[in-house]
């Protein structure tokens, strides 16, 4: 595996572990701006690195999650359903990363189901 890709997989897995914990904390304390900023920063970093490395599937998932997190930063209330949806996105990203590590390329497939759910949630919390 390319060193840059190996480092990306390692760092992203570490970030995802932190995200899991932070999302649970955020669900318990949705008005905590520090937790929200940390979550947003981690997702934004993952998205940006995916774009740099040419991983469009991962980038699209991270972008959709980042957009929803941005709504929370703008003051929209975070529901349990929204946090669960972001956790499902994190799980999907982990699955894709496992395949990326094994196959040394992003797996084929689409994530329109999850991205559409995230987009619908953005519309719901944004209105």
Please place each PLM-identified region on the residue numbering:
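Non-catalytic helical tethers at domain boundaries
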Residues: 1-127
């Amino acid at each position: 595996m390319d060193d840059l890709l190996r480092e990306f997989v390692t760092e992203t897995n570490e970030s995802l572990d932190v995200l899991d914990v932070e999302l649970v904390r955020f669900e318990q304390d949705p008005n905590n701006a520090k937790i929200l900023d940390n979550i947003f920063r981690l997702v934004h970093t993952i998205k940006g690195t995916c774009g740099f490395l040419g991983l469009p599937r991962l980038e699209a998932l991270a972008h959709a999650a980042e957009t929803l997190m941005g709504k929370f930063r703008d003051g929209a209330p975070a529901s349990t359903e929204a946090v669960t949806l972001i956790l499902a996105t994190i799980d999907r990203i982990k699955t894709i990363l496992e395949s990326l590590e094994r196959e040394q390329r992003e797996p084929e497939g689409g994530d329109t189901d999850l991205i559409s759910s995230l987009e619908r949630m953005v519309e719901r919390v944004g209105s």
